[in-house]
Amino acid sequence: RIVVVDPGRGGKVVCACGVIAVAAGVAPGMALNSALALLPDARVLARDSRRERTLLETVAVMALDFTPRVNLEPPDGVLLEVRGSLRLFGGVRQLCARVGERLRARGLASRIALTPKRLASLWFARSDMEVVLRRPEALAGRLAALPLACTRWPERSLRSLATMDDWPSLVTRPA
């Protein structure tokens, strides 16, 4: 029944919500009044950026058990470079399962996405898509299914990219 609003946006827009709220039809970006119409007994909380950062740092420290290469992607992401850890943990699926188990044991929900490009992994996770893609050539086709908003790029950039048929190829080209 939890609905989180961003005080920086006047406290009138939902920025996150719990499972019960989602089941009732509440979604991030929705006006608070609309959310309350769907879930009148919602528990409305103000977003706390400091606590979010502390939680990300806690997750990052836990992730060091799996790899020494961990990066924070505030406000909601932690990226792990796991190529060197795969053999140690029995492969991709086993490693992802262990990371997920560790997070669940701490009461945290997660979306794990593993791709050859770190931003692509972040975008899949932000889009609620758990994927494991090891071949770079498979990436562009899968990226095309993602909403551009998952990139969190400026609105002007999103409008420009939306006019391009093959925007994923721009992201997946070798550097």
Regions found by a protein language model. Name each.
Residues 67-71, 107, 111, 151-154, ...:
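Residue-level signal for secondary-structure boundary elements
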Residues 65, 88, 123, 157-160:
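Intrinsic disorder/low-structure terminal segments
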Residues 125-175:
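Compact, charge-rich alpha-helical regulatory domains located at protein termini
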Residues 30, 47, 90, 134-135, ...:
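Short coil/turn linker and secondary-structure boundary residues
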Residues 38, 62, 102, 106, ...:
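Generic, well-ordered alpha-helical scaffold segments in large soluble proteins
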Residues 91-146:
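Hydrophobic alpha-helical positions that pack around
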Residues 1-79, 84-86, 92-101, 110-118:
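Residues that scaffold, gate, or flank divalent-cation-dependent active/transport sites
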